[in-house]
């Protein structure tokens, strides 16, 4: 089942074009370009986004062409519809808006900042099932802690996502 061009086109014209809305129009599709953190950052600073969610076979290609819809893929897999993918898409964007997170500084050190995955996290107790929190994290030396976190981020990225390290913007 493919969503017909005239139905979707009328909806777009009634809601976006008629109101001179400057929001970006996005269609979540496995054919689209991969969605990355940098895209979430771009959308979080835009005038908003409207999402088209196809179902089963998607939407008529003419809608994509006529309304300059940006096709975005949420991963290398296929879902029955774009609704579930839209939750992840929106969450990645909304969490970057001012006031959404309690500590906005934490955004700077999480996965994909500097094209690195995030370092390991630890809580109390200091030892659990014979595994101890690394001594450097208990040292109070913030410079050494930052260095350890950076090293661990690089190790984890090399192991799980070496493709991220190929980007020339990554600082080892």
Language model regions located:
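S-adenosyl-L-methionine/SAH cofactor-binding core of RNA-modifying enzymes
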Residues: 5-55, 60
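Internal, active-site/partner-interface "lid" segment
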Residues: 84, 96-135
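Structured adenosyl-cofactor binding patch, chiefly the S-adenosyl-L-methionine
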Residues: 59, 63-110
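Alpha-helical scaffold segments in soluble metabolic enzymes
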Residues: 10, 14, 88, 92, ...
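Short, small-residue-biased leader/transition segments that mark boundaries at the very start
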Residues: 1-3
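SAM-dependent methyltransferases
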Residues: 126-172
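Short glycine- and Lys/Arg-enriched binding-loop motifs that mark or flank ligand-binding interfaces
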Residues: 50, 71, 77-78, 126, ...
